[in-house]
Design a protein with these regions (language model features):
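Glycine-rich phosphate/diphosphate-binding loop of Rossmann-like nucleotide-binding domains
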Residues: 1-71, 78, 90-91, 98-100, ...
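Surface-exposed beta-strand edges and their flanking turn/coil or helix-capping segments
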Residues: 26, 50-52, 124-125, 135-139
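A generic membrane alpha-helix/interface feature
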Residues: 33, 73, 134-136
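Rossmann-fold NAD(P)-binding glycine/threonine-rich loop
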Residues: 80-137
């Protein structure tokens, strides 16, 4: 994944859907990442603590600009925002305030969501489909 060694990295996924959260959880675990999945019933205290300790954050909450630079700890180096909320006159806005991150945390690599994560989702789904096909064939 991403051409990097993820062994020992801590990933936080804010989504438990079968389209985003669960497949990515499997991919990250298979790449020796420690994964925490956060969902709508996770306490705010736990969400805050997990985000502060994450190396990688993947969001899929569907809440525009829910997070900004203050939510992420110094360890965080990669954010993948899988959400996109359309706003009249604007292309779309994700869970993470992109402009805020670019201004205050230029050390973080962040997807802008719009036009990027849809491609990542498609690639992940195709990859999952190939893996299931191979398993069913007995490879």
């Amino acid at each position: 994944v991403f051409g990097k060694d993820l062994s020992g990295k801590k990933a936080v996924i804010l989504n438990r859907s079968g389209l985003i959260g669960l497949p990515l959880q499997g991919v990250l675990i298979n790449n020796n990442c420690t994964v925490t999945t956060i969902h709508s019933r996770t306490s705010k205290t736990d969400v805050d603590m997990e985000l502060k300790n994450a190396d990688i954050v993947i969001t899929g909450c569907g809440k525009r600009k829910l997070f900004n630079h203050k939510d992420f700890g110094d360890r965080c180096k990669l954010i993948i925002d899988c959400s996109m909320t359309k706003i009249a006159g604007v292309k779309g806005v994700g869970d993470v305030d992109l402009e805020d991150i670019l201004l205050y945390r230029p050390d973080i690599i962040i997807s802008s969501g719009y036009g990027q994560t849809g491609v990542l989702t498609t690639v992940a789904l195709v990859n999952n489909l190939i893996q299931v096909y191979k398993l069913n064939r007995g490879d």
